[in-house]
């Protein structure tokens, strides 16, 4: 969802995993996902670590309690039953605001880099720094997904958007 103050800079996918225990809900994970696509022949492609808005840099910023994360949290209030979940999300927002290190909060974070690659450009090395040195995310869970397609990414995107719009 785009951020009105920063067009094209909202969190790509954002959500929560709750668990019900004895009729009460507990916040298990805050899921923070960024999505990139690349047909670069470089492994990993630049969008993993090198570009200004790379998966790594974007997700690291979010995991440190950036304004983008806080805005995503605030927007989430509209989507939940106030009696069940709002207090949990509010507690999380307060924890982020008052805690520079975020060590306890990071334990509840699931960081999800999602990379779209073509069959001709994909390599196991595409996991890059998320695999070789994820230490800056210490405490957080990292679930890295790479989706490989057999067509050009532009064709895949055209087909995807047509499908979403109900054109195919």
Residue ranges, per PLM feature:
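Short N-terminal edge-element motif at the start of the domain
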Residues: 1-8
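Conserved catalytic cores of phosphodiester-cleaving nucleases, focusing on short active-site segments
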Residues: 13-15, 31-37
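Conserved nucleotide-binding/hydrolysis micro-motifs of P-loop NTPases
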Residues: 20, 37-40
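Short, solvent-exposed loop/turn segments that connect beta-strands within catalytic domains
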Residues: 20-28
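Generalized protein targeting/export and membrane-interface segments
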Residues: 28, 34, 41-43
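Acidic, metal/cofactor-coordinating or nucleic-acid-engaging core segments within structured domains
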Residues: 41-112
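C-terminal structured domain segments
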Residues: 106-145
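Charge-rich, low-complexity intrinsically disordered segments
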Residues: 129-168
């Amino acid at each position: 969802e785009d951020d009105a103050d920063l067009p094209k800079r909202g969190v790509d996918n954002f959500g929560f995993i709750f668990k019900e225990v004895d009729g009460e809900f507990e916040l298990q994970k805050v899921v923070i996902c960024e999505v990139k696509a690349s047909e670069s022949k470089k492994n990993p492609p630049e969008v993993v670590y090198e570009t200004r808005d790379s998966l790594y840099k974007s997700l690291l910023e979010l995991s440190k309690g950036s304004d983008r994360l806080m805005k995503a949290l605030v927007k989430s209030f509209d989507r939940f039953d106030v009696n069940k979940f709002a207090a949990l999300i509010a507690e999380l927002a307060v924890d982020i605001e008052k805690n520079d290190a975020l060590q306890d909060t990071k334990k509840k974070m699931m960081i999800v880099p999602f990379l779209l690659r073509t069959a001709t450009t994909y390599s196991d090395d595409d996991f890059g720094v998320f695999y070789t040195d994820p230490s800056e995310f210490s405490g957080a869970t990292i679930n890295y997904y790479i989706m490989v397609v057999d067509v050009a990414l532009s064709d895949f995107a055209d087909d995807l958007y047509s499908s979403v719009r109900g054109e195919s």
